[in-house]
């Protein structure tokens, strides 16, 4: 074995980095230190083996627990509603402080940690869960729908919100295909509707920058057949929004509270699927002026309207949920519906003017094979007090007459005869306003 002098004479890599204390040690002392290092290496190897064994045991436990979780999560689940979520730490701290004050003993093994929950199952059982289950308790809220194990009642998964099937049926699945070019003679009404409904949805940043609060909704009123529903569908198509079509008579139910529940579910569904346009047709069915009545049916209609008022006040205009209502009896509506802050924009749909009637006739006949010499202005002058729906009926009648006569195209005389047909069916005694 080389002596210290020989080691000093040799040029070894890292000599400059050696500690001066090590260089001053004797051979015996270096051998002793080497043995100590060997012992430490053996200890570290033993510790490494122990940790490796513990890691393998832990992996086995994790695998076993995953298998148990998989077995427990097998469908079907029992459906339950979360009643309350409680923080057990606060409860235990309070009980422990009271027990300490009274000189009692505290059993640390039984102290609960974390959050607990109270759930009510579909089998009408109310169960307290000190351990919530596989769902993060911080994400649970009262009234949430969850799936629980039918034996242990542990929460296994969260379920989507439950809505009334009648409300789900109100959602228009197919996107409306109407455009503003399909609506004739309503340029002013289109502009007002775009300002109230479309712009707040598509350019919300502009309203925010200017500090303007967008209207919550709009009320369209006017005689039947003037294009209220058509314009609402065109508005929904332009905004790419979910379209919920509520017919107000559907909200009048036989049982007490059913109509109000439908209104609540409709607005909850609209918030979940935002941006959404809620279109309430024939609003006068539930929005009539309130009056004293002994009949339960009248009181139920009034309760439904009060729930509608509450929902109009309850959601912010920033929620990308807009309400469009249509009626042909604006004179019978309750003043509470018409006040500012609910249906802010009131849009009147009058009977079309002469130029508007000519435009509507051209829109409805643009896909028909017609002669070039049709005088649309003359036809418009002949259809005084016709609404949009009756003008469409004129074009249909003209097409049927041309088909009946074996013609290859629709002539001006066919439109004149179609006007006569519709005029004959038009009752002069019908009044749309009381």
From Swiss-Prot:
Organism this protein belongs to = Saccharomyces cerevisiae (strain ATCC 204508 / S288c) (Baker's yeast)
Q: SUPFAM superfamilies given for it?
A: P-loop containing nucleoside triphosphate hydrolases
InterPro entries (alphabetical) = 26S_Proteasome_ATPase, AAA+_ATPase, AAA_lid_3, ATPase_AAA_core, ATPase_AAA_CS, NA-bd_OB-fold, P-loop_NTPase, Prot_ATP_ID_OB_2nd
Q: Which residues carry this modification: N-acetylalanine?
A: 2
Q: Where does ATP bind?
A: 222-229
**Which cysteine residues pair off into disulfide bonds?**
none
State whether keyword Repeat applies.
no
- SMART domains referenced in this protein's UniProt entry, alphabetically: AAA
The similarity annotation says: Belongs to the AAA ATPase family.
Where is the protein found, in the record's own terms? Cytoplasm; Nucleus
**Keyword entries, A-Z:** Acetylation, ATP-binding, Cytoplasm, Nucleotide-binding, Nucleus, Phosphoprotein, Proteasome
Biological role: The 26S proteasome is involved in the ATP-dependent degradation of ubiquitinated proteins. The regulatory (or ATPase) complex confers ATP dependency and substrate specificity to the 26S complex.
- List the GO cellular component terms: cytoplasm; nucleus; proteasome complex; proteasome regulatory particle, base subcomplex
Q: Does the UniProt entry include the keyword Cytoplasm?
A: yes
Gene behind this protein: RPT5
Protein name as it appears in the record: 26S proteasome regulatory subunit 6A
Q: Name one GO biological process term.
A: ubiquitin-dependent protein catabolic process
- PTM notes: N-acetylated by NAT1.
Task: List residues modified as Phosphotyrosine.
Answer: 180
Entry's Gene Ontology molecular function annotations: ATP binding; ATP hydrolysis activity; proteasome-activating activity
């Amino acid at each position: 074995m080389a002596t210290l002098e020989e080691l000093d004479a040799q040029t070894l890599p890292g000599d400059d980095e050696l500690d001066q204390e090590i260089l001053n040690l004797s051979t015996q002392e270096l051998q002793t230190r080497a043995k100590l290092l060997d012992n430490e290496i053996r200890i570290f190897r033993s510790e490494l083996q122990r940790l490796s064994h513990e890691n393998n045991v832990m992996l086995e436990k994790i695998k076993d627990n995953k298998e148990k979780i998989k077995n427990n999560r097998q469908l079907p689940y029992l459906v339950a509603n979360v009643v309350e979520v409680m923080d057990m730490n606060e409860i235990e701290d309070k009980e422990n402080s009271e027990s300490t004050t009274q000189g009692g003993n505290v059993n640390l093994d039984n102290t609960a940690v974390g959050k607990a929950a109270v759930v009510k199952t579909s089998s009408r059982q109310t169960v307290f869960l000190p351990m919530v289950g596989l769902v993060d308790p911080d994400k649970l809220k009262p009234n949430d729908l969850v799936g629980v194990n039918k034996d242990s009642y542990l929460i296994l998964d969260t379920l989507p919100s439950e809505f009334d099937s009648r409300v789900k049926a109100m959602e228009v699945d197919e996107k409306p295909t109407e455009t503003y070019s399909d609506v004739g003679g309503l340029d002013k009404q289109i502009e007002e509707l775009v300002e109230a409904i479309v712009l707040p949805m598509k350019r919300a940043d502009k309203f925010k920058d200017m500090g303007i609060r967008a209207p919550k909704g709009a009320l369209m009123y006017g005689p039947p057949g003037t294009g209220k529903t058509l314009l609402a569908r065109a508005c929904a198509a332009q905004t790419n929004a979910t379209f919920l079509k509520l017919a107000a008579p559907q909200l009048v139910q036989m049982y007490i509270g059913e109509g109000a529940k439908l209104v609540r579910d409709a607005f909850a569904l609209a918030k979940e699927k935002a941006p959404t346009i809620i279109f309430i047709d024939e609003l006068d069915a539930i929005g009539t002026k309130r009056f004293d009545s002994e009949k339960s049916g009248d009181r139920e209609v009034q309760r439904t309207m009060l729930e509608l008022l509450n929902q109009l006040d309850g959601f912010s205009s920033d929620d990308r949920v807009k309400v469009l209502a249509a009626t042909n009896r604006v004179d019978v509506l309750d003043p509470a519906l018409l006040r500012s802050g609910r249906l802010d924009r009131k849009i009147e749909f009058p009977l079309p003017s002469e130029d508007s009637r000519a435009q509507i006739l051209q829109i409805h006949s643009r896909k028909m094979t017609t002669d070039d010499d049709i005088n649309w202005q003359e036809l418009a002058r002949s259809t005084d007090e016709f609404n949009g729906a009756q003008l469409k009926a004129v074009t249909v009648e003209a097409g049927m007459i041309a088909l009946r006569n074996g013609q290859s195209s629709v002539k001006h005389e066919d439109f004149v005869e179609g006007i006569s047909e519709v005029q004959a069916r038009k009752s002069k005694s019908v009044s749309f306003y009381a």
